[in-house]
């Protein structure tokens, strides 16, 4: 092993420029791969962090002219009671806005503004809240709220938050009843204040469609026929006004698996962040192509160095070195260079997290949040070094010493064929990425700069919530 490391250091000193280009190319490729895969991982795992995620569904109202993510409260209440397979059902009103309140700690009063969402108490059961302290049934009580752990620490430091009060200017207050573990960014559950919904709020209003409706089933297979069973046994006499009727509305319920909501784009009033499965596949392919291009570039550089290294290799053969040992040393040399590039790539990712690049990615790009991806990329770096080094290693050691006297391997037919093939694949992949990026830029430029016939700076646009329209 000492001999292998000594040879590696000798190669690094002798071929500084080639080594530098290899390390820079691979490190940039690995860092780009990690950043792209962070975004892919973020979208693929969206809303998959709950217990029995496959049993959670969002109920959406679908009409002949389109769908919407909101529903009226009495219809949701009737649906929850319609089947024994519904373990828990909840409504959430995301249109409530922010709360302005103060928290007094150690004689100092600090003012905060935080989002508050009114929900059914069963909200914590549907999404299986992990409580750090407090009573899981706290939302059953009026004027009691739940805080995420990060918010509780911001308000009260390391002291217990349960029993503390959020005070308002008019003298009213809310009491903290529980602290739950923060949810990751790629979650429909927001890390905000949760308060029990007023039991009388739109309880009999069939025309007030303001609420997001979630249910948890005892078994995801029981989703089949859930709406048909509800509609067959629904009593129209429950409808107390003329703002809603089954007849003529063409309405049905779509019971959408929660992980699919992230990719659902055909409903209105949906505040869940969106992504496209096709885009994820494209990003994944781009990440792989970037690493492949860097690996081919590494192989090509190693092959190009053959004429300058073959004398040293043949000298080792003359001195009794076995071909298998020499090949192993050459492959290990490539693997070590790839690992060094990988470590430098991690440093580039860390630096990117401190720059504006972080704003281009929805995911948290801190390496500690993606241990699995970091380890997977480490394995890919080893595989890249092995695959990029195995061909040059075998070619460098497969020719007799007489070849050194006759000419250069780099100019031999085999050498030219290998290098031409590698360069061809590399150019095709590179040009493909360049052309794709160019078309995306031109399309984006066209959408942003094409004259529309009016002055965009003088036009105001607003999208009212269902609450504003009711």
Segment roles from a protein language model:
Residues 31, 254, 334-401, 442:
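Small-residue-rich transmembrane alpha-helices
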């Amino acid at each position: 092993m000492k001999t292998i490391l000594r040879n590696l250091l000798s190669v690094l000193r002798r071929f500084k420029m080639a080594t530098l280009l290899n390390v820079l190319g691979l490190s940039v490729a690995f860092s780009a791969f990690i950043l792209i895969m962070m975004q892919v991982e973020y979208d693929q795992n969206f809303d998959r962090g709950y217990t029995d995620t496959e049993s959670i569904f969002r109920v959406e109202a679908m009409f002949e002219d389109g769908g919407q993510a909101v529903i009226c409260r009495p219809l949701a209440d009737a649906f929850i009671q319609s089947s024994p397979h519904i373990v828990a059902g909840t409504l959430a009103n995301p249109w409530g806005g922010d709360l302005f309140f103060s928290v007094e700690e150690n004689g100092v009063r600090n003012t905060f503004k935080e989002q508050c969402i009114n929900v059914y108490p069963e909200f914590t059961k549907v999404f299986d809240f992990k409580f750090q302290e407090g009573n899981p049934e706290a939302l059953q009580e009026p004027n009691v709220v739940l805080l995420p752990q990060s918010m509780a620490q911001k308000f009260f430091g390391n002291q217990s938050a349960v029993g503390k009060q959020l005070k308002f200017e008019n003298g009213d207050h809310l009491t903290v009843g529980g602290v739950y573990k923060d949810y990751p960014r790629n979650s429909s559950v927001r890390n905000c204040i949760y308060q029990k919904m007023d039991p009388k709020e739109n309880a009999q209003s069939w025309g007030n469609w303001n609420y997001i409706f979630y249910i948890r089933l005892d078994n995801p297979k029981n989703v089949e026929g859930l709406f048909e069973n509800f509609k067959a046994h629904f009593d129209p006499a429950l409808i107390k006004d003329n703002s809603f009727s089954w007849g003529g509305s063409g309405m049905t319920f779509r019971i959408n698996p929660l992980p699919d909501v992230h990719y659902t784009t055909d409903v209105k009033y949906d505040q869940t962040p969106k992504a496209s499965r096709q885009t994820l596949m494209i990003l994944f392919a781009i990440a792989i192509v970037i690493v492949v291009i860097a690996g081919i570039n590494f192989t090509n550089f190693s092959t190009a160095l053959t004429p300058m290294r073959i004398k040293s290799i043949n000298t080792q053969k003359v001195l009794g070195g076995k071909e298998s040992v020499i090949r192993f040393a050459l492959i290990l040399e490539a693997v070590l260079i790839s690992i060094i590039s990988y470590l430098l790539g991690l440093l580039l990712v860390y630096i990117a997290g401190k720059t504006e690049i972080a704003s281009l990615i929805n995911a948290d790009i801190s390496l500690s949040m993606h241990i699995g991806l970091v380890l997977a990329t480490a394995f890919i770096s080893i595989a890249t070094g092995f695959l990029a080094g195995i061909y040059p290693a075998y070619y460098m050691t497969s020719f007799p010493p007489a070849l050194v006297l006759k000419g250069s391997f780099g100019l031999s037919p085999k050498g030219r064929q290998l290098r031409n093939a590698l360069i061809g694949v590399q150019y095709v992949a590179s040009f493909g990425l360049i052309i794709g990026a160019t078309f995306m830029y031109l399309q984006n430029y066209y959408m942003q700069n094409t004259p529309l016939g009016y002055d965009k700076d003088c036009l105001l646009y607003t999208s009212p919530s269902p609450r504003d329209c009711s």
